[in-house]
Amino acid sequence: MNDAAPQNPGQDEAKGTGEKDNGGSMSPRSALRTTAGVAGAGLGLSALGTGTASASVPEAAQTAVPAAESDESAAPKRQGRTMAGVPFERRSTVRVGIIGLGNRGGSMIDLFLAVPGVRVVALCDTVRDKAASAAAKVVKAGQPAPAVYTKDEHDYEQLCARGDVDFVYVATPWDFHFEMAKTAMLNGKHVGVECPVAMRLDELWKLVDLSERTRRHCMQLENCAYGKNEMRVLRMAHAGLFGDLLHGAGAYNHDLRGLMFDPDYYEGPWRRLWHTRLRGDLYPNHGFGPVANYLDINRGDRAVSITSMGTPALGLAQYREENMPPGDASWKETYVSSDRTISLVQTAKGRVVRLEHDVSTPHPYSRINSLGGTRGVFEDYPERIYIEPDHANDEWGDFAAYADWDHWLWKEHANPPGGHGGMDYIMVFRLMQCVRLGLVPDFDVYDAATWTAPVPLSHASIKANGKPQQIPDFTRGEWKKSRPGTDSEKPSEP
């Protein structure tokens, strides 16, 4: 039986920062209601500054970790069938609806339009000028004028209900991600969500369960998994060049102080306000996703627990003191998020992954992106490698010498369009290729949940003075089965 989903139910641009400006902590539904009166609060980059600076931490973040054993028996009972290894249903043209047309969505539309076999049929943003600008891009690309939804903060529901949309792309502020992904799947649409896919552990479980029940894919669109260096290291790791894999590290260390206090860049304080609510790693996906791919997390190994520690929260307050005028709204905010969060993730095979997050102190951009095994190590920022027998005498080698290991996607698209060094286009191209050809996606809802779980769990660990927190087995045992991921084989069809 075919288990495809039914048809109807900092760094320079050469490497790319991977920064994705999407989008503050109440439930998503109440956030939607509250933001209705925020002037100029587009879904693309909404203000979301609804509470005071002392807004309470989400309840699910405070009680993020259930009392559970270390195996899959602790997971809630599966309500559907696994989505691991389930292909998309094949189609000649992929019809895309885009929700959120701010900094991220407004630029990503160009890449969807650049991929053959893709039509952008519907757009949604409460800021009408942004929607109109995006619609003009569609027409300029030679496609029919898309349907446009700008009525209010609930109009995205109409986009999701359309019968001519196959895939929904969500690029809104973080509060909206869960609700929009949920709505898309309930309307029979596959959905791709910018980082992070949700902010609460219970929401992650709900997305997993809903994906299984509806047979719709829900994916975290992690562009850094498609970086040129990341994909080269992935192929080398899976070919055994690093020996038996032991450890890795990833991060999102990106000085965002100026952008978070810029009244125009984010079109409101939503990004900064998260620093008044959670103490942990707010953005683990860029670092965790690629390393999880190296280690075959959810494909032979799994993340079991996380231990997190955080520094005092001083950087944003100091920046405000030195740069913001008296009377600025930011003076009402109290920052609690650690300037630097450091987490250690243990896997079922005993490997260790180090994660870092720092967006509020001065430092060069880095995602760390390292991998070590019994035969050597790779470290990024700057890129360097040391593996036996190629290197000796404690001298780093030139990573460029391993260009033959580049992934087929980078060999075919040597100079891809778009930002972040081309990884955005590679991601969109491959995603749309999988949808169009009816292939299994490179990553799925289980990866989305696993890569995002450090958000609430690091907060819980820091609050518990570094006590380890269990990472749920979102796959309910499917992780034990080896299966393909981002290290894909080139399909026979273009």
From Swiss-Prot:
From the UniProt record, which GO molecular function terms apply? hydrolase activity, acting on glycosyl bonds; nucleotide binding
Q: Which domain of life is it from?
A: Bacteria
Span of the secretion signal? 1-55
- How is the polypeptide modified once translated? Predicted to be exported by the Tat system. The position of the signal peptide cleavage has not been experimentally proven.
The prosthetic group or cofactor this protein requires is: NAD(+)
> Which residues bind NAD(+) per the record?
103-104, 125, 174-177, 194-195, 223, 283
Q: Which enzyme type, at the first EC level?
A: hydrolase
Q: Any keyword Disulfide bond?
A: no
Report the co-factor binding details: Binds 1 NAD(+) per subunit. The NAD(+) cannot dissociate.
Instruction: Using the UniProt annotation, give all residue ranges assigned to the region (Disordered).
Output: 1-35, 59-86, 463-494
Residue positions annotated to bind substrate are: 252, 271, 283-286, 365
Report any Pfam family annotated for this entry. Answer: Glyco_hydro_109_C
Which function does this protein serve? Glycosidase.
Q: What is this protein called?
A: Glycosyl hydrolase family 109 protein
Q: Which organism is it from?
A: Streptomyces niveus
